[in-house]
Regions:
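Positively charged, phosphate-engaging catalytic surfaces used for nucleic-acid and nucleotide handling
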Residues: 1-181
Length: 181
């Protein structure tokens, strides 16, 4: 019975893709994410899709080549590889973007959106050229990160992950409730 219901839901989502977005929204809300963060995350998914569409048009292969280019972008903006970043946050198989703060997510989007725009202008023809473009796009966001850190006096990248963000949200809600009593 359960399997049939899940199958029906997926068929309905194929007919009406908005249902998929609504399901994702409900899932993120249940995990304790704020609506603001969820909106950023959904936008990040769109930015990533535009980047991978651009890579597809340049002949970049899904899988290993996507991973190498993503690593170049991440390294250029965050100062660490994707694996190092996941290790910092204590992640194994979890999605790194789902465990980023709003600012980390925005900088990652800036890196990916910039990479997409540079690629459209430079028209890279080889994997090596795509790799250089990925590094350039990441560097733009890396410069923004360094500027933010200089102005705020604190690091943008933290070890906090989704569990920490959920706990923070719960604490804020509890404190607000306690104050209202």
């Amino acid at each position: 019975m359960w399997l049939a219901e899940v199958g029906r839901e997926r068929i309905d989502e194929t007919i009406d893709p908005e249902l998929t977005i609504e399901r994702a929204l409900e899932t993120y809300l249940k995990k304790g994410y704020s609506r603001e963060w969820i909106n950023q995350r959904l936008q990040a998914i769109q930015v990533r899709k535009e980047l991978t569409d651009e890579w597809d048009s340049r002949g970049v292969k899904q899988g290993v080549e996507y991973a190498i280019l993503t690593d170049e972008i991440t390294k250029a903006w965050s100062g660490m590889t994707t694996r190092q970043y996941k290790n910092l946050k204590g992640l194994k198989k979890e999605n790194l973007r789902d465990n980023m703060s709003t600012l980390e997510l925005v900088l990652n989007m800036l890196a990916e959106a910039t990479t997409t725009e540079i690629s459209k202008e430079k028209n890279p023809q080889s994997f090596s050229e795509n790799r250089s473009v990925a590094k350039e796009g990441g560097e733009v966001a890396g410069n923004a990160r360094k500027d933010i850190e200089e102005r705020t006096g604190k690091p943008v990248i933290t070890s906090k992950n989704a569990v920490d963000f959920s706990n923070l949200i719960s604490n804020v809600i509890e404190n607000d409730f306690d104050k209202s009593e």
